[in-house]
Curated annotation (Swiss-Prot):
Entry protein name: Energy-coupling factor transporter transmembrane protein EcfT
Major localisation: membrane
Function (record text): Transmembrane (T) component of an energy-coupling factor (ECF) ABC-transporter complex. Unlike classic ABC transporters this ECF transporter provides the energy necessary to transport a number of different substrates.
Subunit annotation: Forms a stable energy-coupling factor (ECF) transporter complex composed of 2 membrane-embedded substrate-binding proteins (S component), 2 ATP-binding proteins (A component) and 2 transmembrane proteins (T component). May be able to interact with more than 1 S component at a time.
Keyword list, A-Z: Cell membrane, Membrane, Transmembrane, Transmembrane helix, Transport
Alphabetized InterPro entries for the sequence: ABC/ECF_trnsptr_transmembrane, EcfT
Keyword Transmembrane helix: yes
Record flagged with keyword Nucleotide-binding: no
Topology class, membrane: Multi-pass membrane protein
Similarity-based family: Belongs to the energy-coupling factor EcfT family.
Gene Ontology cellular-component annotations: plasma membrane
Location in or out of the cell: Cell membrane
Amino acid sequence: MFQNVIIGQYVQGNSFLHKLDPRSKLISVFILLIIIFFADNWFSSLLLVGLTVMLMAISRVPLLFLYRGLRPILWLVLFTLILHILLTKEGPVLMTLGPIAIHEGGVMNGLFIATRLLTLVMLTSLITLTTSPIDLTDGLESLFTPLKKVGLPAHELALMMSIALRFIPTFMQETEKILKAQMARGVDFSSGPISKRVKALLPLLVPLFISAFKRAEDLALAMEARGYRGGEGRTKLRVLMWNGKDSFVVVSALVIGVGIILLRNG
């Protein structure tokens, strides 16, 4: 299940989003991610959900791939929803399950936060799904260029963020392998109280971190063997080109953001 997480994965394609400059995608998604937290009503929230679904359709990423990738996230969304339903005591009581009273405010807040969380994940995934690792690194480096004036290494920061994003699927695959190995040895992760399940998961941390550090070391050695010495003096085979489509996308994101802020204040 974990190996299907879509964050950090790239799907090769020829869609409108794939052809955009990575900088325009990064700027637009960053604007929309901020605006999500300004959307404090259902109309604004559903508007962002509709926009996200439309962008996913434009990306032409296979629906089955999206479903498999979002399935692990749905457990977190469901957990968030249940937590709000159980802990929020606002509004009239809808039903009572033994000692637990379910309030209207809890259900509405839970659905609202769950929708926001799912939108955040889908928007973040759009960047990596439609942007190759090289383009993503180049785009981040270009956006970080002003940081050079204060002595920060723009290329190294961009490379670090790109590697971190791409490492997520690998990390999830490693978690899945270790889980299956432990289950083959008779460890039960699916039954018993929550405290017992958490204790059963703790032994996974050591091999998981060892594997993560081993992969990081292998990557560092591979980069060093290929002569990587940082971004200073490096040239690029492909130069990023900003055009009218990129300006349109960024301006559209700004207009949507301003509209949602006006709805909030209105």
